[in-house]
Regions:
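Cysteine-centric segments in proteins
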Residues: 1-89
Length: 89
């Protein structure tokens, strides 16, 4: 894996998928729009939830099989941010 490219741009999540968990269903981004392209992720990913004051932040690490993407979802503000892209070797 190469050094991650820092992006820090808001993106649109155009599709979600759901996975069973102990507490019900968890949602994950399935497809985003970035620089005019639709990027579709494989249905495997990591999710971390963080409370930052009054805000609930979800951090996701997703892959399309070629690159890894780190996304930040501000649940309170309903904003998605593409933080980094890392090319797989």
């Amino acid at each position: 894996m190469t050094q991650p490219k820092v992006v820090n741009e808001q993106v649109d999540v155009t599709a979600l998928y759901f996975r069973k968990s102990k507490n019900g269903l968890k949602s994950f981004p399935k497809r985003i729009e970035y620089e005019g392209e639709a990027l579709t992720f494989m249905e495997s990913g990591l999710q971390i939830m963080v409370n930052k004051g009054q805000e609930l932040i979800e951090l996701f690490t997703m892959t399309d099989g070629r690159s890894d993407y780190r996304l930040r979802h501000n649940v309170t503000a309903k904003e998605w941010t593409l933080m980094t892209i890392s090319q797989n070797a």
